Each structure stands twice: as structure tokens, then as C-alpha cells.
Swiss-Prot record:
Residues at the catalytic site: 198, 225, 318
Free-text comment on this protein's domains from its UniProt entry: Contains a C-terminal catalytic domain, and an N-terminal region which modulates catalytic activity.
Any one GO biological process: chemotaxis
Leader sequence segment: none
Family: Belongs to the CheB family.
UniProt organism field: Pseudomonas putida (Arthrobacter siderocapsulatus)
Disordered: region residues: 144-186
Coiled coil: none
Segments forming domain Response regulatory: 4-121
NCBIfam families hit by this protein: PRK00742.1
Lineage per the UniProt record: Bacteria, Pseudomonadati, Pseudomonadota, Gammaproteobacteria, Pseudomonadales
Keywords: Chemotaxis, Cytoplasm, Hydrolase, Phosphoprotein
Name assigned to this protein: Protein-glutamate methylesterase/protein-glutamine glutaminase
EC number: 3.1.1.61, 3.5.1.44
Length: 374
């Protein structure tokens, strides 16, 4: 069956061009259009589309408000269009927090002059998020930030709710989280925590990192597939929400406990044996900039068996080969479970390759990091 799409935008030109591009794909059907957020809610309730494309700035009701209402009344995967500016990044992150699944740059020049490029990106995104867990209501909003833990005192695992046990990788798809009785992670003197993610990652990272105490003992590196204009705004957002410090990584930054470094968009991040971050130009031969495999691979080379790596929600298989190198060196690999993923792609690649030491629900990953490292 064709993927049913509702196109929402106050620009007649953009609404028409998006509809034309999507309709040219025989596996996609545009079932309706709307010019503002209020119309979008009404059309979503009436047409029950599989995917909604949504603009932000619209009369009567903006896109973020519309997304919040839609998620409450008829949860539907939403693809936001956003500008590639710092303000556009902030708005897009707000939309993802409200429940949108993914985003695309809103570029009138591209949609006019590069229709083939836009068609490929847009149709691929629509197909991917149509298979997301958003409609099932299995991916809730971020957990509230816990009360601060004094940095001067250790944070025992008991200061958090008792974490759910791990699920064996072989049964990750079949077993429900509550049905698992596998052991919780063992403590180990990890020198680095490395987390990679893509679609659904901004909300997932927020959920994980807000559970960590200010005195978390291991340095953290974050690899999120995201454009260059977005990563600085995302790091600033996380820094305000978390008890640990978060910043966009710069060349020469030093890893240290209580600090998470986010790989800058459009570039690659590597780590050397002295704990120094190297930021390299994005290689055009690689699909992802930043690339999880690149950072994981450098961590494997520099830290041997002292890395705790986590692969969260995301499309594709980035992170699998880097995780393979980490496993070969004796390090630990965790994957997010299918039920709590927006897109079960990257974690599935880890599980199918038999690289996962444990599979955890998103709600439990932060707690388990505390248990394993603190």
C-alpha cells in the first residue's frame, strides 16, 4: 500500500512542489494539504495519514503547537521543514521535543533547481519515518530532569530508580522489556563512554544524559547525525538541561569526567590515546558527517577494552563496523531496544551482527550507565 501523506505549509509554491515531488513516487499518495496548524490537526483527524510534512511558521497556529496537538489526539510521524540557521536549529529541536520524528532543510532554491536531489531525500525520509514507532505511542517525551546531585559526593546507583535488567541480544526483538531477567551491567573502570545515534537521537540523548550526575566519572563523546548549523544549538540545549557539561567538540579539546563532547555537524571526530579530540573535515566519500564508525574506530584504537559504547535509535547501520572494532578490543557495546526506538535501524544492525553485550530500553540506559561507571 502507498504511504499516505498530508502536506502542511502556508506557502502555496512550497505546498504544491512538495505535493508534486511526493506524488511522482508511485509508492506515496498525497491525501491532502493544509495551510496552517489548525487545518493540519483537522486534516490529520479526518484523513489519518501515515506521515505529515510540516512547516513551522504559519498563520493561526504554528507547526510546533500543531505537532503537540497531533501527538495528543492522533499520533502520526511528522517530518518538519526547517531553515539551516541557529534559530532554525532551535525551532527544529523544539519540534522534535514536541514529537516530530525528523526534519529536512527548507530550501526554495534546491526545490526549484535540484528536483531529483530533493525528491530522493524527501521520499526516502517519508518512507523511513512511516515505519517509525511514533504512531504506536511507544516513544514518549523526554523524562523530566532529576534533582541535582552534588558534584562533591559520589552518586550511588540507589539514587536512581532500580534499573530494568538487560535483554540478551538474540531475544531483543521478541521479548518485552518487563519479561527480561538478565543481569544488570557489571562495574568496570571505563575510560570513555561513546554514544552514536541518528533519527530520534536528539530526544533520546536528552533522555539518557539528563539521568547522569554532575560527577559522572567517565568522559563522554556523542555522535549525532546532524547538519553543521544544528550541532552547536543542540549542544547548548543539552548543556542547559543536564547536570554534566555538554559542548560542541573543537579540535584539541581534552576528554574529562563530567563532560560530553558532541561531534560537530559536517565533520568527523576522532580521539587519540592522550584523550585529545581531533576534528577533521567531512570526507565526501562517507554518507555521514559526523560518522559513528569513525569515532568508535578511533576509540577502539586508543582505549582498547576500556570503552562503553551505546548505539541508539537511527536509520541505517552506521556504528556497526566501529562497534565490531570495539568488541575485538574487548570493549562493551550496548544497543537500544526496538520498542523504544523511533527508527530501529542502527541498533538492529548491532544486534543482527551479534555485537550487542546488552539491549536496553531507552528509559534504562542512563541508569545503567550510572550503575556501570559510578
Amino acid at each position: 500500500m502507498a504511504v499516505k501523506v498530508l502536506v502542511v505549509d502556508d506557502s502555496g509554491f512550497f505546498r504544491r512542489r512538495v505535493s508534486e515531488i511526493l506524488s511522482a513516487d508511485p509508492t506515496i499518495q498525497v491525501v491532502g494539504t493544509a495551510t496552517n496548524g489548525k487545518e493540519a490537526i483537522d486534516q490529520a483527524l479526518a484523513l489519518k495519514p501515515d506521515v505529515i510534512t510540516m512547516d513551522y511558521e504559519m498563520p493561526m497556529m504554528d507547526g510546533i503547537t500543531a505537532v503537540r496537538h497531533i501527538m495528543q489526539r492522533c499520533p502520526t510521524p511528522v517530518l518538519m521543514f526547517s531553515s539551516l540557521t541557529h534559530e532554525g536549529a532551535r525551532v527544529t529541536l523544539d519540534a522534535l521535543d514536541a514529537g516530530a520524528v525528523d526534519y529536512l532543510p527548507k530550501n526554495f532554491e534546491d526545490i526549484s533547481r535540484n528536483p531529483d536531489k530533493v525528491k530522493q531525500m524527501l521520499c526516502e525520509k517519508v518512507h523511513t519515518i512511516s515505519r517509525s514507532n511514533r504512531r504506536l505511542g511507544s516513544y514518549a517525551r523526554p523524562a523530566p530532569v532529576a534533582a541535582p546531585v552534588p558534584a562533591s559526593s559520589p552518586a550511588p546507583a540507589s539514587s536512581f530508580a532500580s534499573p530494568a535488567p538487560a535483554r540478551p541480544a538474540a531475544t531483543a526483538r521478541a521479548a518485552a522489556p518487563a519479561a527480561s531477567h538478565s543481569p544488570a551491567p557489571k562495574r568496570k573502570p571505563y575510560k570513555l563512554v561513546a554514544i552514536g545515534t541518528s533519527t530520534g537521537g536528539p530526544v533520546a540523548l536528552q533522555r539518557v544524559l539528563t539521568q547522569l550526575p554532575a560527577n559522572f566519572p567517565a568522559p563522554i563523546v556523542l555522535i549525532q547525525h546532524m547538519p553543521a548549523a544544528f550541532t552547536k544549538a543542540f549542544a547548548e540545549r543539552l548543556d542547559k538541561l543536564c547536570r554534566i557539561n555538554v559542548k560542541e567538540a573543537e579540535d584539541g579539546d581534552m576528554l574529562r569526567p563530567g563532560l560530553a563532547l558532541l561531534a560537530p555537524g559536517g565533520k568527523q571526530m576522532m580521539i587519540d590515546g592522550r584523550g585529545t579530540v581531533k576534528i577533521l573535515p567531512g570526507d565526501e566519500r562517507l554518507n555521514y558527517k559526523p560518522c559513528v564508525d569513525i569515532t568508535f574506530g578511533s576509540a577502539a584504537k586508543s582505549y582498547g577494552d576500556k570503552v562503553l559504547s551505546v548505539v541508539l535509535t537511527g536509520m541505517g547501520a552506521d556504528g556497526r563496523e566501529g562497534a565490531r572494532l570495539l568488541k575485538q578490543g574487548g570493549s562493551t557495546v550496548w544497543a537500544q531496544d526496538e520498542a523504544s526506538c523511533v527508527i530501529y535501524g542502527m541498533p538492529m544492525a548491532i544486534v543482527k551482527a551479534n555485537l550487542a553485550d546488552a539491549v536496553y530500553s531507552l528509559d534504562d540506559i542512563g541508569k545503567h550507565l550510572v550503575e556501570a561507571c559510578v
